[in-house]
């Protein structure tokens, strides 16, 4: 087994079969059609079941990788002049339960998110079951004009999260899904209540970083200012360099800082 496969915690088929059997029994199905997603995902094995449920299988290795990511992100937060606000989960089941609850809370405050079904454990694996959204596109798969049109809605949804005391913690273009011109958030991570305000600024920095390569710095800042204040964006500036060193973000931090500085004066 190659190292990347081992570290990512990919689940062998016999173990997946046990999980599929559990799903079949829980939902009263004689047969289930399972389709695995070709996703570059270090934190779970994702699959679509009967085109009805989106299922994440989370292994102990996935939990270990999450712990490593959490440590790295907290070190990055320290480098931005604030205490770390990311939190780790103790077990694969806790990872699944957190995402289930985060998805439920987003829906409760009126945001679009897949309908949460349940989280449970099978042989030490955490299993998360959500509604499957069959006709979605991730934000970065749209044409530029449509991305510009939807950008204000992305920032408004993020503002709504923060107004209700929630934080996403891992906002990237692939975690923003578009279904019939509606914006859906997925894959929220775990942040501490004590670091709420810093985590909101970090979220906003991530949103700016996700949008800038798609529509440019000026259009990104204009879209953000439809729901956020210049002071909000100035607070986010402190996290842009930290976000910029993440391998899953690639954007022009200097351009964003320049436009934010112009708008804030």
Can you say where each PLM-predicted feature lies in the sequence?
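A glycine-centered beta->alpha junction motif in the catalytic cores
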Residues: 60, 75-85, 129-144, 188-191
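Short beta-strand micro-motifs within the conserved protein kinase catalytic domain, predominantly
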Residues: 115-125
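C-lobe/activation-segment region of protein kinase-like
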Residues: 188-264
């Amino acid at each position: 087994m190659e190292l990347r496969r081992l570290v990512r915690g990919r689940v062998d088929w016999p173990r997946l079969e046990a999980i599929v059997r559990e799903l079949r029994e829980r939902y009263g199905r004689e047969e289930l059609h399972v389709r695995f997603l070709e996703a570059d995902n270090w934190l779970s094995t994702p699959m679509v079941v009967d085109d009805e449920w989106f299922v994440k299988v989370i292994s102990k290795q996935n939990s270990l990788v999450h712990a490593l990511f959490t440590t790295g992100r907290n070190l990055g937060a320290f480098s931005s002049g604030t205490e770390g606000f990311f939190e780790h989960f103790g077990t694969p089941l806790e990872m699944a339960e957190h995402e289930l609850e985060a998805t439920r809370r987003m829906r409760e405050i009126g945001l679009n998110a897949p309908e949460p079904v349940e989280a449970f454990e099978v042989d030490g694996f955490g299993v998360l079951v959500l509604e499957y959204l069959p006709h979605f596109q991730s934000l970065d798969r749209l044409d530029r004009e449509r991305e510009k049109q939807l950008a204000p809605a992305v920032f408004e949804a993020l503002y709504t999260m923060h107004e209700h005391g929630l934080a996403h913690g891992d906002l990237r273009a692939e975690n923003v899904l578009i279904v019939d011109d509606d914006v859906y958030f997925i894959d929220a991570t775990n942040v501490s209540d004590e670091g709420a305000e810093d985590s909101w600024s970090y979220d906003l920095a991530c949103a700016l970083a996700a949008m800038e390569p798609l529509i440019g710095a000026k259009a990104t800042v204009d879209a953000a200012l439809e729901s956020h204040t210049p002071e909000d964006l100035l607070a986010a500036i402190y996290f842009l360099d930290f976000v910029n060193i993440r391998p899953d973000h690639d954007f022009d931090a200097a351009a964003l800082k320049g436009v934010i500085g112009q708008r804030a004066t």
